[in-house]
């Protein structure tokens, strides 16, 4: 290996490490959301539809709302929804999409990092987050924080990627960010009763490629 080859490989690894770090930090998402290209489909996440359709609409908090697809769906079902994300550009996109969808009057927006989330005394009938994956197993701490925002009689819904051979191309930091639903149970206080704790298979087609993966799904209800 020549010095030039080694340097080129080192630069590639450095760029990859930086990209991985950016994936978990606000700056990386601010950059992604700064352009005009739509990143997500805008469709609601399927486990949200499955679990929430039968609930009585009230107030909802969607943490890690991105471009607002789940927020808009909830608002259309009659919920009053707060979309929360650590990206100001993402929140701006979500607000525009809500306006275009005709549900701006049922939505509001909150810039917050889930890793340091404090509900500041606010509670919601539904607290939900989908595919939020803080690094190094940090989801347990995030769930502990989200629990504080669940009103008496309210629900917490957490959905994420379960470890799967589908994700073999990702690095170890991404793998450590994945979780199974059972791992989150330690974050639930006694008055939050698990309703659903499972990995649900889902077939996804993106860019013409179809893969099978599992959604780690935790639904819990607070007594009261």
Language-model features, listed with the residues they occupy:
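Conserved class I S-adenosyl-L-methionine
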Residues: 2-55, 58-66, 164
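A short acidic, Gly/Pro-enriched loop at the edge of an enzyme's catalytic core
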Residues: 115, 119-126
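Conserved beta-strand signature within the Rossmann-like core of class I S-adenosyl-L-methionine
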Residues: 153-161
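A short glycine-rich, Lys/Arg-flanked "PGG" loop and its adjoining helix->strand segment in the class I
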Residues: 140-152
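Conserved SAM-binding strand-loop segment of SAM-dependent methyltransferases
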Residues: 102-114
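A short SAM/SAH-binding and catalytic strip from SAM-dependent methyltransferases
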Residues: 125-139
């Amino acid at each position: 290996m020549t010095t030039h080859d080694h340097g080129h490989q080192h630069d590639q690894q450095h760029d990859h490490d930086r990209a991985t770090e950016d994936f978990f930090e606000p700056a990386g998402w601010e950059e992604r959301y700064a352009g005009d290209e739509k990143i997500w489909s805008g469709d609601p996440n399927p486990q949200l539809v499955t679990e929430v359709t039968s609930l009585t609409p009230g107030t909802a908090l969607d943490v890690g709302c991105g471009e607002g697809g789940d927020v808009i769906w909830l608002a259309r079902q009659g919920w009053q929804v707060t979309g929360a994300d650590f990206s100001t550009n993402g929140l701006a996109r979500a607000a525009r999409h809500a306006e275009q969808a005709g549900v701006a009057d049922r939505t509001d927006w909150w810039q917050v990092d889930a890793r340091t989330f404090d509900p500041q005394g606010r509670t919601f009938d539904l607290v939900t987050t989908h595919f939020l994956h803080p690094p190094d197993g940090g989801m347990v701490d995030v769930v502990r924080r989200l629990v504080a925002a669940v009103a008496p009689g309210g629900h917490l819904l957490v959905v994420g990627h379960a470890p799967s051979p589908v994700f073999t191309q990702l690095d170890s930091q991404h793998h450590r960010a994945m979780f199974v639903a059972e791992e989150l149970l330690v974050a639930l206080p006694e008055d939050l009763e698990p309703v659903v704790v499972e990995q649900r298979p889902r077939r996804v087609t993106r860019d013409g490629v179809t893969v099978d993966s599992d959604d780690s799904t935790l639904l819990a209800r607070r007594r009261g």
